[in-house]
Amino acid sequence: MMPSESGAERRDRAAAQVGTAAATAVATAAPAGGGPDPEALSAFPGRHLSGLSWPQVKRLDALLSEPIPIHGRGNFPTLSVQPRQIVQVVRSTLEEQGLHVHSVRLHGSAASHVLHPESGLGYKDLDLVFRVDLRSEASFQLTKAVVLACLLDFLPAGVSRAKITPLTLKEAYVQKLVKVCTDSDRWSLISLSNKSGKNVELKFVDSVRRQFEFSIDSFQIILDSLLLFGQCSSTPMSEAFHPTVTGESLYGDFTEALEHLRHRVIATRSPEEIRGGGLLKYCHLLVRGFRPRPSTDVRALQRYMCSRFFIDFPDLVEQRRTLERYLEAHFGGADAARRYACLVTLHRVVNESTVCLMNHERRQTLDLIAALALQALAEQGPAATAALAWRPPGTDGVVPATVNYYVTPVQPLLAHAYPTWLPCN
């Protein structure tokens, strides 16, 4: 005779089954806006999805359970937030207000880290994507109101909430607030402040034309089954007892994209669609030891990315601001050597592959990059500053992070900026 199950065991087994069913339902449902490109789906039918292994599920669970400080401005206290907590509160409140959440996903570098932490890239921001319908302005406003209201729940005990308004919370804890509403893109982003750069970014997506630059950052991990398991089961997860968690590659073929991540390969689709920041990510990957796939037309890829960079950031002030923000986010603190190497690589790529600018505009940008590179070089200490040089990049574009430097001549910084078109006398 089989031993009878206790009530707790029955609930736990049901939780695992429900979690698995939830993952299957979300993964097999028709993709909401912002999913893989239809061209990728037709090229790789069914291959854009894959189940996570037990070690990957463990890493995901640990990442969602790790408290992240949300730093307040002025006298506002620091909030300690577990990602799974804020996801559950935001999701349940949106559902109560009548806005259905199709799925919640972990996206970007954090998802890549869960799948393969040995890539060397690590992660900064925690990108959490809520698939919702944003058909009206009221839906956009609701997502913002819900996120701001949920911050009240995470205020430390003893803090008076009586006079705290949503506007006050936005000024105190929101790093960035973005709304995009066009024919092809309907989404909003709320980024919560963290002084170390590990911002919690809540993105509400109805439709978006492209959510990745290269195959290695195209991963999304569907969190619904894991979150449901945590709510329903009192038994800790184990290799023999855990929910099915599904990953998706917006690039197309999940297995191929994961192999690119493991072997440090740079690959993409439709490079003409990559936004301006893709150029900086490309140079970052080269410095980290990634290589373009052998079949890649590197010159064409670089020309596309340079052109898009100058379309998205047309003037020198925007270029400086974009470069400084990217470098601070990815090469902060004591990583001056790699920051310098990234700027050297960017200088080379812009010099070789920019075809859309007049000569003086191109020279201005190169001077800006050179000035930032020399600043990063000086931060490495007297030995590096005395050498005042950098090792030239190899044929693969990689610049070693080292103080054995080699100088290349650069144009002196221009004292004056010129308009795009010089006046005709």
UniProtKB/Swiss-Prot annotation:
Listed disulfide bonds for this chain?
Answer: none
Instruction: State the function annotated in the UniProt record.
Output: Catalyzes the transfer of one adenosine molecule from an ATP to an mRNA poly(A) tail bearing a 3'-OH terminal group in an ATP hydrolysis-dependent manner. May be involved in maintaining the translation efficiency of at least some genes through preventing degradation of their mRNAs. Prefers RNA molecules that are adenosine-rich close to 3'-end. In addition, may inhibit cell proliferation and cell cycle progression through ubiquitination of beta-catenin/CTNNB1.
Query: Disordered: where is this region?
Result: 1-42
**Changing E213A: what effect?**
Substantially reduces polyadenylation activity
The EC number on file is: 2.7.7.19
The record lists the effect of K176A as: Loss of polyadenylation activity
What does the UniProt record report as the effect of altering I216S in this chain?
A: Substantially reduces polyadenylation activity
One biological process term in Gene Ontology: positive regulation of translation
GO CC, any one term:
nucleus
Sequence similarity: Belongs to the TENT family.
So what does mutating R269A actually do? Substantially reduces polyadenylation activity
Q: What is the effect of changing H330A?
A: Loss of polyadenylation activity
**Positions with biased composition (Low complexity):** 15-31
Q: Which UniProt keywords apply?
A: Cytoplasm, Nucleotidyltransferase, Nucleus, Transferase
- Its top-level enzyme class, in one word, is transferase
Xref: Pfam families: NTP_transf_7
MF terms per GO, please? Answer: poly(A) RNA polymerase activity
Name of the encoding gene: TENT5B
Q: What is the effect of changing K281A?
A: Loss of polyadenylation activity
- Record carries keyword ATP-binding: no
User: What is the designated name of this protein?
Assistant: Terminal nucleotidyltransferase 5B
Q: Where in the cell is it found?
A: Cytoplasm; Nucleus
Q: Which reaction does it catalyse?
A: RNA(n) + ATP = RNA(n)-3'-adenine ribonucleotide + diphosphate
Among its keywords, does the record have Nucleotidyltransferase?
yes
